[in-house]
Amino acid sequence: MSFRKLIYISAVILAVIACKKDEETESTPYLNGNLTIVGLPEFVAPGESVTLSPKGAEHPDGGEITYAWKVTPSMTKYETIRVFKHAFSDTLRTYTVYCSASAEGYTSITGMSYATVVAPGPNGSIQGIKFKDIAEDTVYVRHMPYYYKTIGTQTWTLNNMAVRTGVPFRNAEVMSEVFGRYYNFNEAKAACDSLDTATQNWELPSKADWETLEAYITGNSAYGKTITAAMLAPATFNGTKLYDYWPTVGDITNGSGFSAMNVGYANTVAKSTKGEKEYAIFWTADEANESEGYYKYLIIDQPGLFTGKGDKESFGASVRCIRK
């Protein structure tokens, strides 16, 4: 038999085998259902342990299903177990969690979700704001430092309040001291009261206080091209910028030292948040009417410090305080 003929016969045999495998693969049914992961928070602390379980996979014949798990980039191989326990590392980043459901004679299905490791503090998730270089001093509530600085004739706190009322970002408690919390109108006033000491009195700033701040910053062109650029911090969250460059605003400089972060706003009833990377919103002490209060806000792509109204009970904004 010639070599060419042998090669031809071999190719035909391989093609038949391949076709048979394709037919087998195509004829293998999938497990039923949509596999999801139960017990995984969106944000976790360094070293936090979680216990995860699968939900939604169904065997068409009621047979046994085998589950396997993998967390990347921490794991290179799947671990076969139904209820999976995992301790996240101290590295601040987003991890992908996979769960695979398989059964003999069926094509497996996979569920996937994410968890981000976050931490507060100078070496934490927020970088780009050097509070110790900007601030004049610090006041503590429990273990949490609140930095403050004199801007013009006023003394302002430089980081968002995080005392335990209001709601945290996406209702994740571990984010409380990272972005600060979102408070309704009445909670905002109480948050500033928590800073009071024997020698210092702190209050929620009025509209007039904010307007004084605005006039001082806009009168100092060295702070930045616009008030938005001068008040927003060039902050990053786990290495990702919280801001984009807009020619109308100019380079984000934080020249005033105010260190605003565009972390959006909340519905304190639904415990949901929106507008991150777009708005930095702060309550004032002034009522607009019986059901609404005034707030001040920055928009990442627009120059100006604007005024809005929010429901006293359900609208959640960040809080800064002024020393009186």
Per-region residue spans from a language model:
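Surface-exposed, flexible coil segments in extracellular/virion-facing regions
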Residues: A68-A87
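Surface-exposed, short loops/turns at beta-strand junctions within beta-sandwich domains
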Residues: F88-T94
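Bacterial Sec-dependent N-terminal signal peptides
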Residues: F3-L6, A11-P41, Y106, T110-I134, ...
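Coil residues (strongly favoring Ser/Thr
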Residues: S49, T80, T91, D137-T138, ...
